[in-house]
Design a protein with these regions (language model features):
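Glycine-rich phosphate-binding loops of nucleotide-dependent enzymes
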Residues: 1-123
Length: 123
């Protein structure tokens, strides 16, 4: 099964017995995705998954996420990278531990995100 996921996600390693820490940052992220996707979980939680990942790996992972989402899986992730938001159907903006905005993809703009992130709450 590991070889199948290595090929599907294009993890670059000759030996599947290598420690994950011996892989590049992008391949470590791919290995973590493979582990999550190999489960039967319908909701996958990700914490800033593209931090430190090269552009090519990001595109590979985004394609994989879209493919899995079309099959009914849900991906919920925290990100600090606004370019990742292009891959989201819905975006929630948090401030002080609470949701201050819920934006559909069609209404998503950087201005709305910044305003929601820093605007003072109405009295």
């Amino acid at each position: 099964m590991a070889a199948s996921w290595r090929d599907r996600i294009a993890i670059r390693t000759d030996d599947l017995d290598n420690n994950i820490l011996s892989l590049s940052g992008g391949n470590q992220q791919k290995a973590l995705f493979a582990r999550a996707l190999a489960s039967d979980a319908q909701i996958i939680l990700m914490d800033d998954p593209m931090r430190g990942v090269d552009f090519g790996t990001k595109l590979d992972v985004y394609d994989l996420i879209r493919s899995e989402a079309h099959q009914g899986r849900t991906f919920l992730w925290y990100t600090t990278e606004t370019d990742e938001l292009d891959n989201c159907d819905r975006v929630y903006v948090f401030r002080n531990g609470g949701i201050v905005a819920a934006l559909d993809h069609s209404e998503l703009t950087e201005e709305k995100i910044i305003h929601s992130s820093f605007a003072e709450a109405a009295p």
